[in-house]
């Protein structure tokens, strides 16, 4: 599974639509292009997520509707509901920044209870090793996963290739990988060039809608389409290819599933200043 974060501010973000529809867009709430991107994604059958702003340890500005560590549960619920109104077709949530917020229990419990009420899934972007996101999500019964690789916190071609290869190694070792990237022109161009190579290595890009098919809102929004292609998917089960889907990552930019093995998601690193 590959998730692209931070969509909604820049006109250049629409270039991400040139990528396969299995790539998930995570859209920032109340941004100038949020509704436009969400609507187009829905028309194309592409799953979208809400990229929910949360407080960082650095104190960096979160943007509209950010969640802070001093908020009461009611305020957290209110902000999430308001954020969802700007991306109404979102089927899941991941954190934008959040190295402070995701590390504290009460706020995350309030957030994830509302995520569950709305039938969404949660992907922990893991901007801190101290995050309690997936731990609490699992306890509350929220479908969840965790990011394993950040693709592009440096935009040099050599670094992008290094992370892309790292992604493939994890997928082959564990049977899946969850990757997060961003709609930078450099990232979009890199993915357009390198995604075709996955099939040659027995890797297949898979949408979060397929990985989280058990999440209520995913089932409601994508169930009909999935049923129409069920016979094809059943045939694919016999294939020995590794499927790039989103499990523990989010349990980008992505998860890869192997017909031969399913491992526990390997969690690596954090994004600087988030």
What residues fall within each predicted segment?
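A cross-domain feature marking catalytic cores of carbohydrate-active enzymes
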Residues: 4-6, 27-29, 50-54, 95-97, ...
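A polyampholytic, Gly/Pro-enriched intrinsically disordered region
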Residues: 49-52, 71-72, 143-149, 167-173, ...
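Active-site beta->alpha N-cap acidic-glycine motif
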Residues: 1-60, 64
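C-terminal domain-boundary segment and adjacent tail
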Residues: 115-128, 183-257, 261-273
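Catalytic domains of cell-wall/extracellular-matrix polysaccharide-remodeling enzymes
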Residues: 74-165, 172, 176, 182-203
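Active-site mouth loops of central-metabolism enzymes
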Residues: 1-4, 64-74, 153-158
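Catalytic-core regions of hydrolytic enzymes
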Residues: 44, 61-84
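Short hydrophobic/aromatic-enriched beta-strand-loop microsegments
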Residues: 23-27, 47-51, 143-148, 201-206
């Amino acid at each position: 599974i590959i998730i692209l974060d931070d969509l909604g501010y820049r006109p250049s973000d629409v270039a991400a639509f040139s990528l396969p529809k299995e790539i998930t867009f995570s859209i920032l709430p109340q941004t100038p292009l949020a509704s436009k991107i969400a609507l187009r994604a829905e028309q194309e059958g592409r799953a979208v997520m809400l990229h929910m702003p949360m407080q960082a340890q650095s104190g960096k500005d979160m943007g509209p509707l950010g969640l802070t560590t001093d908020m009461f549960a009611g305020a957290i619920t209110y902000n999430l509901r308001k954020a969802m109104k700007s991306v109404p077709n979102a089927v899941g949530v991941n954190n934008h920044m959040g190295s402070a917020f995701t590390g504290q229990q009460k706020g995350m419990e309030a957030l994830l209870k509302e995520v569950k009420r709305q039938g969404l899934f949660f992907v922990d972007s893991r901007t801190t090793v101290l995050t309690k996101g997936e731990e609490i999500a699992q306890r509350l019964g929220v479908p969840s996963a965790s990011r394993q690789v950040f693709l592009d916190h440096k935009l040099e071609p050599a670094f992008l290739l290094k992370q892309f290869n790292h992604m493939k190694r994890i997928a082959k070792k564990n049977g899946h990988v969850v990757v997060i990237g961003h709609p930078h022109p450099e990232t979009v161009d890199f993915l357009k060039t390198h995604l075709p190579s996955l099939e040659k290595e027995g890797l297949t890009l898979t949408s979060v809608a397929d990985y989280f098919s058990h999440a209520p809102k995913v089932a409601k929004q994508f169930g009909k389409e999935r049923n129409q292609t069920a016979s094809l998917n059943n045939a694919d089960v016999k294939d020995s290819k590794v499927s790039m889907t989103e499990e523990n990552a989010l349990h980008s930019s992505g998860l890869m599933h192997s017909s031969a093995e399913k491992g526990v998601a390997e969690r690596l690193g954090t994004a600087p200043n988030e």
